[in-house]
């Protein structure tokens, strides 16, 4: 498991491009039959990627759960949101119950699920499971939310190059969680700016992952304090960590889709 420590805004001003990318950028999440995990000390969030091809992959494969979390199993004191962004469908099994995820479907697993595994329906077209996990203090209910069931909020306009639809999956309007919130924002063709106006939220960090970005295209992800902005060039299926003091916005050379994940104190937000 890759460990990322939190940085502060005063030090961040002096970072080189390489230091900034090492601190915030997450790449290479999808390796065949492996579980890739990045632990951030910003709100203790864990970002994971899994592309099962020929095997059924356990959530703790390659992870020393006791050494990293001080628990006996991954979700003993954690909750997790799972999206399928792969070419094919896949199945998540949690304590013996199977959940089938098509493209862009989401699964919320609450604290206390002991055995969690991932598999693809077709090895020629594997699922890609993108996940974010946050600490949890109590248990709610596991829930599968399809893309059709997500709460939808159209925003922006063609004139401002940010016409988009926010799909709220793991959100107070859809289900209860301890602190995790996740959703998916899809930009329409001809639009390339997301999250405008850019902003910060003092009580929540945020993680973005960009996908549906055509080959050869990139996203310039904006970060830093509002008066000291920087950018990180990102490619398809990269993810990026945003501390609470950092803006998080981006512009692409094409339209794209991104998944946002937040953890923190408050749950009420637009």
Identify the residue ranges that each predicted region occupies.
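Conserved metal-binding segment of the jelly-roll/cupin
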Residues: 101-121, 233-254, 259-263
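Short, glycine-/Ser/Thr-/acidic-enriched flexible segments
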Residues: 52-53, 88, 215, 226, ...
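A short beta-strand-loop-beta hairpin characteristic of the jelly-roll/cupin
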Residues: 74-102, 211-236
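N-terminal non-catalytic cap/leader segment that marks the start of a structured domain
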Residues: 2-85, 89
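Double-stranded beta-helix
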Residues: 123-164, 224, 259-270
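Acidic, low-complexity central loop/insert segments
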Residues: 86, 90-126, 132-135
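A short glycine-rich, His/Asp/Glu-containing loop-to-beta-strand
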Residues: 28-68, 163-206
């Amino acid at each position: 498991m890759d460990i990322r420590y939190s940085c502060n805004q005063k030090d961040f001003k002096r970072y080189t491009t390489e230091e900034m990318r090492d601190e915030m950028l997450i790449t290479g999440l999808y390796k065949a039959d492996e579980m890739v995990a990045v632990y951030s000390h910003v709100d203790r969030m864990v970002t994971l990627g899994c592309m099962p091809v020929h095997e059924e992959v356990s959530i703790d494969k390659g992870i020393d759960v006791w050494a990293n979390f001080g628990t006996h199993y991954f979700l003993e004191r954690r909750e997790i949101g799972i999206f399928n962004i792969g070419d094919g469908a896949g199945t998540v099994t949690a304590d013996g119950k199977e959940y089938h995820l098509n493209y862009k479907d989401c699964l919320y697993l609450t604290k206390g699920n002991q055995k969690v595994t991932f598999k693809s329906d077709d090895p020629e077209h594997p699922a890609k499971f993108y996940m974010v996990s946050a600490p949890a203090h109590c248990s709610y209910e596991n829930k599968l939310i399809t893309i059709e069931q997500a709460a939808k909020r159209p925003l922006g306009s063609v004139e401002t190059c940010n016409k988009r639809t926010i799909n709220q999956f793991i959100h107070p309007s859809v289900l209860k969680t301890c602190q995790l919130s996740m959703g998916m924002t899809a930009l329409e063709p001809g639009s390339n700016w997301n999250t405008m106006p850019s902003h910060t939220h003092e009580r929540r960090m945020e993680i973005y992952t960009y996908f549906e970005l055509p080959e050869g295209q990139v996203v310039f992800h904006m970060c830093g304090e509002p008066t000291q902005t920087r950018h990180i060039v990102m490619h398809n299926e990269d993810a990026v960590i945003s501390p609470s003091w950092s803006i998080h916005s981006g512009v692409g050379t094409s339209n794209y889709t991104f998944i946002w994940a937040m953890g923190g104190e408050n749950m009420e937000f637009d």
